[in-house]
């Protein structure tokens, strides 16, 4: 990142309140937000809400457009609408839930190269014997009763951070700690920062980062069905080295001239992807689909789990009222591949809207 490379940096102040409300369901007078789960304001959140918010065009917006207020009142849904989105997230990463040296090094490299990593800790331990208030050091070894319930950010690390800094009742075996930034003000920890042992049982369970983003919005429309993001996984086996194909049919939103410039996908494993487009209608046969040249060439490979954007070398004009986008996926296992979907589940995903005849998967390239 720019700070690490001693380059000019820019500080952004995005609206937490907008994310809180834009990812919630019920507004004033019982009005429902159609593009989210059943989550309500004040009920907490996690990456399953935050990452789709940043990748589906809902946000982020500047703090000045919807400033923080210390309340959870019902508001008019108009308060979250027609805001100026000021950031676009292209690629994210989900790290392994592992305390291996390899995974720790991957996280360190991400912090050094791209910036902070979102993680979870057991927040209640701040008032428990897992925390040393004099040093701001946290080490939890209770995997059964002290689970993740609070989100923080890894902003650095200290391989030599001594075990003597931790509460004497619960100390890790080895030195070393992540430096985390909390959201509880400067009076907690060391001016708002804390040290979490590399051996903490929660620190690797929910780890996510942003790989590529921009403060320039270079699109007018996003075509999508999965506003709530990836919440389920399917697997196709017996492939014997063959890829699978995912396709969506979209209806053009305007009567004006539009071009497709990029396609997004969530990878559940290592993928190599190729993109095909039919800009002339809803046909999905091989003869209908045109191979797209990407900025990376004929294909693009992703090694890490997460949301990814495949950028076109040249824009493709939409010539009909409907069009098709298809992605060919080759997974890391030659015999099977998993892929993510947005599913209608009980509880928070019970109201997810699923449209029939719009999304397809096949192993035969729609022949």
Could you describe each region identified by the protein language model?
Residues 270-355:
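Aromatic- and Gly/Pro-enriched, solvent-exposed loop/edge beta-strand patches characteristic
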Residues 1-8:
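Alpha-helical support elements that line or immediately flank enzyme active sites
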């Amino acid at each position: 990142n720019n700070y690490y490379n001693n380059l000019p940096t820019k500080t952004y102040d995005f609206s937490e309140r907008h994310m809180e409300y834009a990812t919630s369901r019920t507004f004033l007078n019982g009005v429902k937000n159609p593009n989210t789960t059943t989550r309500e304001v004040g009920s907490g959140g996690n990456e399953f809400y935050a990452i789709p918010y940043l990748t589906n065009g809902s946000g982020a917006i500047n703090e000045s457009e919807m400033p923080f207020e210390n309340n959870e009142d019902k508001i008019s849904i108009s308060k979250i609408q027609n805001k100026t989105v000021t950031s676009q997230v292209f690629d994210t990463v989900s790290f392994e839930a592992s305390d291996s040296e390899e995974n720790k090094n991957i996280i360190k490299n991400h912090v050094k190269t791209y910036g902070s990593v979102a993680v979870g800790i057991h927040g209640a331990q701040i008032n428990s014997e897992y925390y040393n208030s004099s040093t701001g050091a946290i080490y939890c070894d209770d995997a059964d009763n002290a689970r993740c319930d609070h989100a923080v950010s890894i902003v650095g690390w200290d391989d030599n951070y001594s075990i003597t800094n931790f509460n004497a009742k619960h100390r890790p075996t080895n030195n070393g700690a992540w430096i985390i930034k909390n959201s509880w003000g400067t009076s907690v920890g060391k001016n708002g920062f804390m040290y979490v042992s590399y051996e903490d049982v929660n620190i690797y369970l929910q780890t996510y980062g942003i790989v590529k983003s921009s403060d320039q919005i270079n699109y007018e429309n996003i075509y999508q069905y999965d506003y709530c993001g990836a919440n389920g996984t399917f697997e196709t086996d017996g492939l014997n080295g063959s890829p699978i194909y995912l396709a969506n049919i979209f209806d053009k939103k305007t009567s004006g001239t539009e071009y497709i410039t990029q396609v997004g996908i969530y990878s559940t494993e290592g993928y190599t992807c190729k993109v095909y487009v039919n800009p002339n209608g809803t046909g999905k046969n091989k003869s209908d689909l045109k191979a797209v040249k990407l900025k990376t060439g004929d294909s693009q490979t992703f090694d890490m789990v997460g949301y990814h954007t495949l950028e076109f070398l040249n824009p493709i004009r939409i010539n009909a009222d409907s069009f098709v986008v298809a992605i060919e996926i080759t997974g890391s296992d030659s015999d099977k591949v998993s892929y993510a979907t947005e599913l209608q589940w009980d509880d928070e995903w019970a109201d997810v809207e699923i449209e029939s005849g719009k999304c397809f998967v096949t192993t035969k390239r729609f022949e």
